[in-house]
Curated annotation (Swiss-Prot):
Keyword flag Hydrolase: no
InterPro entries assigned: Thymidate_synth/dCMP_Mease, Thymidate_synth/dCMP_Mease_dom, Thymidate_synth/dCMP_Mease_sf, Thymidylate_synthase, Thymidylate_synthase_AS
Residues noted as binding dUMP in the record, renumbered to the chain: R21, R126, R127, R166, S167, C168, D169, N177, H207, L208, Y209
Main function: Catalyzes the reductive methylation of 2'-deoxyuridine-5'-monophosphate (dUMP) to 2'-deoxythymidine-5'-monophosphate (dTMP) while utilizing 5,10-methylenetetrahydrofolate (mTHF) as the methyl donor and reductant in the reaction, yielding dihydrofolate (DHF) as a by-product. This enzymatic reaction provides an intracellular de novo source of dTMP, an essential precursor for DNA biosynthesis.
Chain positions recorded as (6R)-5,10-methylene-5,6,7,8-tetrahydrofolate binding sites: H51, D169, A263
Gene Ontology biological process: dTMP biosynthetic process; dTTP biosynthetic process; methylation
Main location class: cytoplasm
Listed name of the protein: Thymidylate synthase
Pathway membership, UniProt: Pyrimidine metabolism; dTTP biosynthesis
Protein EC: 2.1.1.45
Cell location: Cytoplasm
Keywords: Cytoplasm, Methyltransferase, Nucleotide biosynthesis, Transferase
Amino acid sequence: MKQYLDLMRRVRAQGTPKADRTGTGTLSIFGHQMRFDLRQGFLLVTTKRCHLRSIIHELLWFLNGDTNIAYLQQNNVSIWDEWADDNGDLGPVYGRQWRAWGTSDGRQIDQLAEVVRQLKQDPDSRRIIVSAWNVGELDKMALAPCHALFQFYVANGTLSCQLYQRSCDIFLGLPFNIASYALLVHMLAQQCDLQVGDFVWTGGDTHLYSNHLQQADLQLTRDPLPLPQLLIKRRPATLFDYRFEDFELTGYDPHPAIKAPVAV
């Protein structure tokens, strides 16, 4: 994952100091792209230990269309706690938009089910896109979508994905986001009888928080290690029937974890 460290170096060298919604302050650049070959290993950062269990549970939660943190809390995943209301609700965030986008005439669109249909029936389509950026519901969301839109592309039997992330917390958020979408590509490839291809990440406001700079500098002293391998042990009936125990990671021997505060 040299690309990730190169991005961090770029922001440290060229980033502009900016104020932000959280009041923390950032070093920020605008516009950056990274390309990863998913065939080379599972995209989990090795220059610090990442919490794959949380990544898997969060993705399963998204895929279930859930927007209440009860499932996450039951599985000891706390990454959304700071934004939930007293009832654990987050409003119409990712899961709602992915699985039940509301239309003006009262219908609901399951964008991910449509992705599966298109990948199987019309894989050359240029419209295999999922958006979480529902302008009409942004004011109801506890947190506006950071990873806002993603598109799939099939060529020569391989499945690739490009994500546009309008706002990116490089140190804490980005390793989660990359691994989550890599996992989704692996799941969709299995469901649609494809091989994994590339994951392309495109960032808008791409930043290091001012209270993450020392941690970033420490991470930049470390050399990337070999990527782990992902095994999906079962092929469920649909994309929405995967369980946590279906996934096994082997060969993950990263550098030690580096703690940093979350900007809320």
